[in-house]
Amino acid sequence: AYRKVHHPPIAEMKDFGIFLAGELERFIDETHLDRSRMLGVGIALPAVIAPDNSRITLAPTLHLRDITLQFLAKEIPYPTYIENDATSGGYAEWFLYWHRDMAYLLLETGVGGAVLVGDGQYHGVNRRSGEFGHMCVEPGGLPCKCGKRGCLEAYCSAWRISDDLGIPLSEFFAGVERHVPEYETMWHDLLRHLAIGVNNIRMVLD
């Protein structure tokens, strides 16, 4: 079952947690899921999460920094685990392909990733491994929401298209198919930097 809802701005984590718990219960009721069979709830966020799972260290696309997570799952009456969105997507692919070692690259509003080897994710010292979106693919290049310049995310994310052109993705790709010069130029620039990023990942991980 699947449901998409619009959420209020994440200004207060406590209020957002109450909203999230309410939407979850509504979803369970509408889809007639058996609560007694629920193993738990997963919350995926486009954010760097502290090693102890206590706070968001940085979430550029959400405009959040150093925000506590203690209230996010407080109203949810099921075991709840909070994880980075790209890591969650990486695990889904990892299970699908029978636990093969892999690097997962996610292109959405931002750019993320995960490295999964052996029995699970390689976290790194600060639980930041797989942040492929913030590897440099153009020294001194476009500014990124993380504060650096030349990041893969600055070139290959949906927000670049929406910020630079002021249009949604659907309109952008329709324009590429119609050979609109401005859109084609950005598309080829995006592909060039994506190729650099993918090649970097390949060379590092073999």
What are these regions (language model features)?
Residues 8-11, 75-76, 82-86, 137-170:
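Glycine-rich phosphate-binding loop plus the immediately following alpha-helix
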Residues 11-34, 152-155, 160-206:
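Adenine-nucleotide phosphate-binding core of ATP-dependent small-molecule kinases
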Residues 11-16, 128-140:
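A short, polar/charged loop-to-alpha-helix boundary motif
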Residues 84, 107, 125:
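Active-site flanking residues adjacent to catalytic metal/cofactor-binding acidic residues
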Residues 93, 114-118, 122-124, 137-138:
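Short beta-strand-to-turn element immediately C-terminal to the catalytic PLP-Schiff-base lysine
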